[in-house]
């Protein structure tokens, strides 16, 4: 059996996480809306790039100090995704710029000890390329300017992600549980 690496897409509300998720899995699986809070639970899909496959998790937008139960549950789902992932795509929005929520999420991700790739989203013109420099303050080594909606920069982002994914290794079959099908003669064991 082969285990797949897990990549979580994390960020504050409305930065384009679900659009990026749909682009990475090459399907329109996640609902995309300009209204905040559309993605609530973790949403899973599968992706393949340069000979490596991996699971992608779309998460709801992390809310700084989420007050109501709804926001607290979304934040809890984001924390679970961070814990179960091997690699995190921290998605930020160049249109709205760096804010306190980005800083708080950044601290959370630095503490996680996971590989984090920063995706500065909505970079679809030269003016916005200049605006991306403020995100260097977040302190992530791997940063990519992307446009999830039109796909620019996502190839380079994926190239970096798959560098963190180990080559497939078979799990030791000695550690897998054994089982037997038992029963009376002609009871349908072979079926």
Which positions does each model-derived feature cover?
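Conserved G1/Walker A P-loop phosphate-binding module
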Residues: 2-71, 80-81, 92, 163-191
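Conserved C-terminal guanine-recognition region of P-loop GTPase G domains, centered on the G4
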Residues: 73-142
């Amino acid at each position: 059996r082969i285990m797949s690496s897990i990549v979580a897409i994390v960020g504050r509300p409305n930065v384009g996480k679900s659009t990026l998720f749909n682009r990475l899995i090459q399907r329109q699986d996640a609902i995309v809306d300009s209204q905040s809070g559309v993605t609530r639970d973790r949403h899973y899909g599968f992706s393949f790039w340069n000979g490596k496959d991996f699971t992608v998790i779309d998460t709801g937008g992390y809310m700084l100090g989420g007050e109501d139960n709804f926001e607290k549950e979304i934040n809890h789902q984001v924390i679970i995704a961070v814990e179960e992932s091997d690699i995190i795509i921290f998605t930020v929005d160049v249109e709205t710029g760096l804010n306190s929520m980005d800083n708080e999420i950044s601290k959370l991700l630095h503490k996680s000890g996971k590989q984090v790739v920063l995706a500065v989203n909505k970079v679809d013109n030269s003016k916005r390329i200049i605006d991306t420099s403020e995100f260097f303050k977040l302190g992530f080594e791997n940063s990519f300017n992307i446009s999830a909606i039109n796909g620019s920069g996502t190839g380079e982002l994926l190239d970096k992600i798959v560098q963190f994914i180990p080559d497939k290794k078979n799990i030791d079959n000695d550690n897998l549980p054994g089982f037997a099908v038992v029963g009376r003669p002609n009871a349908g064991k072979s079926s």
